[in-house]
């Protein structure tokens, strides 16, 4: 008899549906109980698709007194009294891509659903959303005799898409500030407030007025509140990993290593254990294939716009040092720096910490993020991710087949096809493109490889050859070859067998 197939909660973000439907669930309810028992106001920042909505839903069920759902879970064991509180749960991810009028209406609709439930229609003007919100909470408390709970999931979602458009941002921000403003004055009526998001918008009343709002985003004991740890993977997902290993024709231990290499590596404070991206991990185990699942859902538009407006040195993203802790929480409104946003959105994570000056080193968390992000950056030069991906595959194959001339012809064609409006003809521009191309070739390729007296642009290894590349802009191939010899770039690879030096010149005029 075939074993019962595991139900993976793909697209399922509500706690009750997961528990009642018998879906795979990693128990995080101990965190929920501890936070509810310790704080009154909590804020958590995590990247998209990292489990924030499921955690919000878990808080909802916990405070709604749905005891049966927690049977056999940590919170069910710890909690003694299951008081039913009126819960106001606002999912702001449904309020994206709107203008001011649409945002006002959808917030009003969210309130009206609760007003019907609690009989809070007091004749307040429909567009007076803050007064309606305040009256609603008070009515629920009066009707039940229990303090209320407010859960705001993805609180910043309505603002993210207009973040780079100040003309639209200012009125939208005012609407959201107005909506959130009653929370402080409602303190006597509130048992608990839980807020999630990606960024920390400084000019919203949530952060300026709620002085007792506890930001747990970088607190070590809550580093694994979202996502999946190695111990959780090996304890609760052993059979899915075995199934993946069988499907891929590798050992169980090799499957674990591949999962770690592709989807692990997130750190939300210094000294924390590695955290897996739960979305990609579960998608991989369900499909039994290693894929770029997080990137299939798309890179946020606001991030791409910010990167175009404020370009970064892509060659240094894998090791950004001397980042202060205050940079992690900096509001996107108050800085043009893209780096904090890359951390907040999950494209970079903490890789190191210096205790002396309290600075952090950031880098890509894993292979999925690194390759997906580099592909996206390369696509910015070609205005088409599909064309860029196809080129990298062909270029990779030519090198593996030791067809250097063919690979250079492909590179020439790729460079010539870059739209003029994306090309600035500086040497740094071409260096960046070369870096992106070679970084995407795979594990056997290294970029900017140091030797004793210099740094080679790229080193590529095939089964029987090692290629050392040097590129010049508006110079000559002969100059590049002389630099390889003069700087001793090939010396470390002589013992590996057949070494080939490749000097390439790029003309900024013809881009060939």
Give residue ranges: language-model regions.
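Structural motif
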Residues: 149, 465-467, 500
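Active-site metal-binding core of divalent-cation-utilizing nuclease and nuclease-like domains
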Residues: 140-144, 437-463
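Phosphate-binding site recognition
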Residues: 1-426, 441
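Nucleic-acid nuclease catalytic cores
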Residues: 477-481, 490-512
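Mg2+/Mn2+-dependent nuclease catalytic core
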Residues: 170-174, 473-491
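Conserved catalytic cores of phosphodiester-cleaving nucleases, focusing on short active-site segments
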Residues: 434, 458-473, 487
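Extended alpha-helical scaffold and adjacent linker segments that couple domains
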Residues: 394, 398, 406, 461-464, ...
């Amino acid at each position: 008899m075939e074993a019962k197939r595991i139900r993976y909660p793909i697209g399922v973000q509500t706690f009750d549906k997961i528990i009642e439907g018998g879906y795979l669930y990693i128990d995080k309810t101990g965190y929920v109980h501890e936070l509810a028992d310790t704080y009154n106001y909590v804020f958590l920042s995590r990247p998209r698709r990292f489990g924030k909505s499921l955690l919000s839903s878990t808080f909802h069920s916990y405070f709604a007194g749905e005891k049966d759902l927690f049977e056999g879970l940590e919170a069910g064991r710890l909690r003694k009294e299951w008081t039913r509180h009126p819960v106001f749960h606002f999912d702001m991810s449904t309020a994206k891509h709107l203008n001011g009028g649409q945002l006002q209406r959808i917030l009003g609709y969210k309130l009206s659903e609760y007003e019907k439930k609690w009989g809070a229609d007091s004749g307040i003007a429909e567009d007076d959303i803050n007064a309606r919100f305040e009256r609603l909470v008070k009515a629920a408390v009066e009707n039940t005799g229990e303090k209320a709970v407010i859960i705001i999931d993805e609180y910043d979602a309505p603002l993210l898409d207009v973040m780079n458009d100040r003309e639209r941002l200012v009125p939208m921000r005012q609407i959201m500030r107005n909506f959130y403003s009653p929370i402080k004055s409602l303190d006597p009526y509130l048992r608990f407030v839980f807020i999630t998001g990606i960024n920390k918008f400084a000019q919203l009343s949530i952060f300026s007025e709620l002085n007792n709002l506890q930001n747990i985003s970088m607190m070590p004991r809550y580093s694994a509140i979202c996502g999946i740890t190695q111990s959780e993977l090996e304890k609760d997902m052993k059979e899915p990993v075995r199934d993946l290993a069988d499907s891929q024709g590798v050992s169980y231990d090799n499957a674990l290593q591949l999962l770690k290499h592709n989807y692990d590596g997130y750190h939300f404070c210094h000294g924390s254990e590695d955290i897996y991206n739960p979305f990609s991990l579960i998608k991989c185990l369900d499909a039994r294939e290693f894929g770029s699942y997080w990137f299939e859902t798309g890179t946020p538009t606001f991030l791409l716009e910010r990167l175009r407006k404020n370009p970064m040195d892509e060659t240094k993203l894998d090791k950004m040092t001397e980042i202060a802790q205050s940079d992690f929480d900096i509001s996107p409104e108050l800085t043009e720096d893209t780096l904090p946003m890359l951390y907040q959105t999950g494209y970079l994570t903490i890789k190191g910490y210096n205790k002396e000056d309290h600075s952090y080193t950031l880098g890509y968390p894993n292979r999925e993020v690194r390759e997906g992000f580099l592909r996206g950056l390369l696509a910015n030069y070609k205005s088409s991710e599909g064309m860029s991906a196809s080129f990298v595959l062909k270029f990779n194959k030519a090198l593996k087949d030791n067809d250097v001339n063919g690979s250079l012809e492909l590179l020439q064609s790729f460079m010539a096809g870059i739209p003029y409006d994306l090309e600035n003809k500086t040497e740094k521009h071409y260096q960046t493109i070369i870096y992106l191309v070679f970084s995407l070739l795979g594990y056997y390729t290294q970029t900017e490889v140091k030797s004793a007296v210099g740094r080679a642009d790229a080193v590529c290894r095939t089964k029987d050859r090692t290629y050392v590349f040097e590129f010049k802009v508006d110079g000559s191939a002969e100059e590049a070859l002389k630099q390889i010899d003069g700087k001793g770039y090939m010396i470390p690879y002589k013992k590996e067998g057949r070494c080939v030096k490749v000097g390439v010149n790029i003309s900024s005029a013809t881009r060939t």
